[in-house]
Design a protein with these regions (language model features):
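A short amphipathic helical element positioned immediately N-terminal to and/or at the very start
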Residues: 1-16, 209
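Transmembrane helix segments
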Residues: 41, 156-199, 203
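Alpha-helical transmembrane segments and their short interhelical loops
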Residues: 97-169, 216-240
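Transmembrane alpha-helical segments of integral membrane proteins
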Residues: 202-214
Length: 251
């Protein structure tokens, strides 16, 4: 437990010491999205009955920012440690695979939640959102960050250089987040693309998180929870296997 806490604190300090880059920058990016899309589309789109498009955007942008930053936190830390050789100082102490995994995962969740809170704070002047179901908001915030944080661990272990990690982000994370209903309700899509959206686990994170605010979504929150929790379990098992085997860490 002492080893876990030490590594966890180290990961928290790693992103907090450069909070202007790791927290404020993504919050500013989300604010710009909010300004542009709400200005252009707020008078033309009503995603949910009785919910303005401006309000509709806020939870989606918050969850998108949380997911992207949870992934970035764990993946960038691991790849940086591997490239600089500092990973050896994490492998020498008697850390179990579970402690190693939990420290990186929880730090990623913390960064994601902090960024999400910042996005909600700066966009609140567009229309203060009071969650209809706060527990759903909390559950999907934690699980959403958990899924992408775990995927970040897998990517950080797999990648040998920053170019490979960038490809992972550009060709997997970016499409999954942008095509997940952040800027639209999938009920507005043609049948084919609606079906494709249902295959995207990030869609369920965003829809469940949005349900917590408005009490309505494109699918049942219980279905969203099942998909997100199942995705987390699969990725966590894969990540723990990679850590325990020493794949690209001890090899």
């Amino acid at each position: 437990m002492h080893g876990f806490m030490t590594l966890f604190k180290k990961e928290i300090l790693r992103f907090w010491k450069v909070a202007f880059q790791t927290v404020m920058a993504p919050v500013l990016t989300a604010l710009l999205y909010q300004l542009i899309f709400s200005h252009v589309l707020s008078q033309h789109v009503e995603a949910y009955p009785g919910v303005s498009y401006t309000a509709f955007l806020i939870p989606g942008l918050a969850m998108m920012s949380m997911a992207q930053n949870a992934f970035a936190n764990s993946s960038s830390s691991l790849i940086q440690s591997k490239i600089t050789g500092n990973i050896v100082f994490l492998l020498l102490p008697p850390l179990t695979a579970l402690e190693f995994f939990a420290a990186y995962l929880l730090a990623a969740v913390v960064r994601g939640v902090v960024v999400g809170a910042g996005v909600l704070a700066v966009t609140s002047w567009f229309g203060l959102l009071l969650p209809a179901h706060p527990l759903w908001v909390l559950v999907f915030a934690v699980f959403g960050c958990g899924v992408l944080g775990t995927l970040g661990i897998v990517a950080g272990i797999w990648a040998d250089k920053f170019d490979q990690l960038a490809a992972f982000q550009n060709f997997l994370i970016m499409p999954l987040t942008f095509l997940s209903g952040v800027f639209y309700s999938i009920n507005s899509l043609p049948p084919l693309w609606k079906t494709v959206s249902h295959l995207n686990p990030v869609f369920y994170m965003i829809d469940g998180f949005r349900y917590g605010f408005f009490g309505q979504g494109d699918v049942s929150p219980w279905l969203s929870l099942a998909v997100v929790a199942g995705s987390f379990a699969l990725l966590a098992g894969w990540s723990l296997h990679l850590i325990a085997s020493g794949y690209k860490l001890r090899q």
